[in-house]
Regions:
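Short, structured segments at the rim of ligand-binding sites
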Residues: 1-431
């Protein structure tokens, strides 16, 4: 699908943030194993969460879908209904449920799709190997097969690549036989780890933070085996990752301000860092009872480290195109194993719109030089966050056509509907 986004001034001053797929996927995973029925209200309808529910059912959980709620009846030990799981294009789904699959005493295959077929899964295989689990067929284009069962162990792991495997390990090891001690080095996305710990605690799982050195990115965790998650009722928090695009839109296109609601946070979210990034970039915002209010204005410049919140690169790279001075975004190395190679895609696609982007792997930075934005046709490269970022260039700069606009369904299906409700002019392009 190709959409054309035209320069627009917002005509409405309030929008609700989408539900957090990061929170919901963690709840689904634990609810799959939990004793009793977990009731999820305000669920995310993203493709990633749809696939997470499919995998929960494939592992033996019973799923009931309501109008604005989902009920999950967990089962443990797992009773897989199929020999394979279908994560779709979800990196978290692959790694989280790939580790849960190791709780089963037998092989289960992870059927990857789309861009996920080319993403690196060596971290999953290496981590599971440390706990006696073999993973076969991990090359690009292959469907990994996990051979459980997983057992507790004392291990040292490199956690520099992603926090997603660690999330799966914490969920699974609590239910495995034997206790575990995880000595983690190079921990990235610490806020995502914290989110996992908080969801685990709410569902009755104890994980002890024995020691932490934040400066050295080292973390020592103790997980007692033989636990069982407890069902709970939970309303899914609003998603700061999706809200970041709405907040950027408010800065660039609101006549005065934009209220982004539904952002009361039960759990830690890495991308809440968008608030600090905007403030340091000279933007004005204030808290409200239900979320945040952003004021319209021209950003000065962004100088921010996004190592722990790499999903903020696309919205900030779009905002930076309209700043007064060049912006420097640190954490470039985190962008290579996403739905696209986001660093290079931002560089190549922004160039089509007349925006120069420099990538420096030595300093781990992306430098975005401000506009003016030129009319162009950009490709999402099948990446939901690139489609949303391209829409910001069109709404605030010059007409932008977006190839593959449907990619937003991965995390924020009604993104373009929400933009239109705010007054952004969007046209469907034939062909």
């Amino acid at each position: 699908m190709i959409l054309r986004v035209l320069p627009s001034t917002l005509t409405s001053d309030t929008v609700w943030a989408p539900p957090s797929k990061s929170v919901m996927q963690r709840v689904i995973a634990l609810a799959t194993l939990a004793d009793g029925r977990t009731m999820i209200s305000r669920p995310s309808e993203s493709d990633d969460c749809t696939h997470a529910l499919m995998m929960a059912a494939q592992l033996g959980a019973d799923i009931e879908l309501g109008e604005d709620a989902v009920a999950i009846h967990g089962t443990f030990p797992l009773k897989p209904r199929e020999t394979s799981l279908t994560p779709g294009e979800s990196g978290l789904g692959l790694r989280l449920f790939g580790v849960l699959a190791a709780l089963h005493d037998g092989p289960l295959t992870l059927e990857r799709a789309g861009s996920l077929l080319q993403r690196d899964v060596s971290g999953l295989a290496e981590a599971l190997d440390a706990f006696g689990v073999k993973v076969q067929h991990t090359a690009p284009g292959e469907h990994p097969t996990v051979h459980g069962p997983i057992r507790g162990a004392h291990v040292s792991l490199d956690a520099a690549g992603s926090s997603q495997v660690l999330t799966g390990l914490l969920c699974a090891l609590a239910h495995a036989s034997g206790d575990s001690l995880l000595n983690l080095h190079g921990v990235v996305s610490r806020p995502y780890v914290q989110m996992t710990l908080e969801v685990l605690e709410d569902m009755g799982i104890e994980v002890d933070v024995v020691e932490e050195d934040a400066d050295e990115r080292q973390l020592l965790l103790r997980v007692a085996g033989g636990q069982r998650a407890k069902a709970m009722d939970v309303a899914i928090d609003g998603d700061w990752s999706g809200a970041a695009f709405l907040m950027a839109l408010g800065v660039l296109c609101a006549p005065h301000h934009l209220n982004v609601e539904g952002l009361h946070s039960t759990y830690t979210q890495a991308d809440e860092a968008i608030k600090g990034a905007l403030l340091f970039g000279g933007c004005r915002l204030a808290g409200t009872d239900e979320g945040v209010q952003v004021m319209a204005g021209k950003p000065k410049s962004f100088q921010v480290d996004l190592t722990d919140s790499p999903d903020l690169f696309p919205p900030l790279a779009a905002l930076a195109a309209f700043a007064k001075k060049p912006s420097s975004l640190r954490g470039l190395h985190r962008l290579g194993n996403k739905e696209s190679n986001r660093g290079r895609v931002i560089q190549s696609e922004w160039a089509k719109a007349g925006i120069r982007v420099d990538l420096n792997e030595t300093t781990d930075t992306m430098v975005v030089h401000p506009g003016p934005v030129q009319s162009a046709r950009l490709s999402s490269h099948g990446d939901h966050r690139m489609a949303m970022a391209a829409a910001l260039l069109g709404a605030a700069g010059a007409p932008i056509e977006i190839e593959g606009a449907e990619a937003v369904a991965k995390s924020y299906p009604p993104f373009f509907d929400d933009l239109e409700s705010l007054g952004v002019q969007i046209q469907t392009v034939a062909g």
